[in-house]
Structures are given as structure tokens and as C-alpha cells.
Regions:
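N-terminal intrinsically disordered, low-complexity leader regions
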Residues: 1, 11-13
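Cysteine-centered metal-binding/redox modules
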Residues: 7, 15-152
Length: 152
């Protein structure tokens, strides 16, 4: 009798794990909800210097973030969302984006650090070297981490 109960529990557990895995593979909520995306983006502008608003007209943005990082403007200008470790432009993430994702100045991707759609020509003060994410497998790992699951 104990064997059947154990088997049933195991089947239920496997089923739950499959549901969780599917959840991690879904599009991040902010890619599908403009209000949530805007809220997260605005918080990143306010708290983490996300910018410049218009990459073609940056104003004094690069000077300000260079001061924040205690570096040169030239160095700051190379630290972009497009080469940040949390910037996701994997095939699966591009499928989550609404419409056209690129223009002459860059590409729209997803920021796993701040949970919003961001542009590759911008930056923020939490930039970290090592990106972008171009592989679906790596994107899924970031998705798991975003939902609080430890990496295997």
C-alpha cells in the first residue's frame, strides 16, 4: 500500500515540477503588461539612473553616470544595456516583445535585474559586464532566478 502512495506522490510532484518549468518559460509579466513595464522602468529611472531618455540626445546623462561610477565619460558610454549581463535578447525573449524590436540605434531587450523592456543604447548604475543573453537556456536560468528558484 505504501508503494502506491509513494508512486502517486511522485507523479504529483513531477506534474508540479513540469508546471513550474512551463511557468519559467513563459514571457516575463512586464513584457505583456504595459502598466507593469512602465512602473518598473520608471522606478529604474528614479532609483538607478536608467537613461538617457533619448539616446540620440543624451544631454548630460553620460557625465552624470560617469560621476556616479567615478570614471570617464568615454568609459561610461561603453557600459550599455546592450552589453550588460542581465540584458536578454534570446530568441525566446524576442518572441515576447511586441512588434519591432530594433531601430538604427539598437535593439529592445528585457532587463532581468529591473524587470522591464529596455533599449540596448541605454544604461543604468547597476550595469554589470558580461552580456547580452543570447541563448534560450541562459534566459530560462535567469527566469528561474527571477522567480526565486536556485540554479541547478
Amino acid at each position: 500500500m505504501g508503494g502506491k502512495t509513494t508512486h502517486t506522490k511522485r507523479v504529483k510532484m513531477i506534474s508540479l515540477l513540469r508546471l513550474l518549468e512551463q511557468k519559467f518559460k513563459e514571457c516575463p509579466p512586464a513584457t505583456q503588461d504595459v502598466d507593469l513595464n512602465t512602473k518598473n522602468r520608471d522606478e529604474t529611472v528614479k532609483n538607478h539612473m536608467y537613461g538617457p531618455l533619448n539616446p540620440d540626445e543624451p544631454g548630460d546623462y553620460w557625465e552624470k553616470i560617469a560621476d556616479k561610477w567615478n570614471t570617464s565619460v568615454e568609459a561610461a558610454r561603453t557600459s550599455l544595456c546592450g552589453n550588460c549581463t542581465a540584458f536578454d535578447i534570446s530568441p525566446r525573449m524576442l518572441e515576447c516583445m511586441p512588434g519591432e524590436v530594433s531601430d538604427e540605434s539598437g535593439v529592445l531587450g528585457y532587463c532581468w535585474m529591473h524587470h522591464f523592456k529596455c533599449h540596448s543604447a541605454r544604461s543604468c548604475n547597476t550595469w554589470a559586464k558580461g552580456g547580452p543573453i543570447k541563448d534560450d537556456k541562459i534566459s530560462y536560468i535567469w527566469g528561474k532566478k527571477a522567480f526565486g528558484e536556485k540554479d541547478d
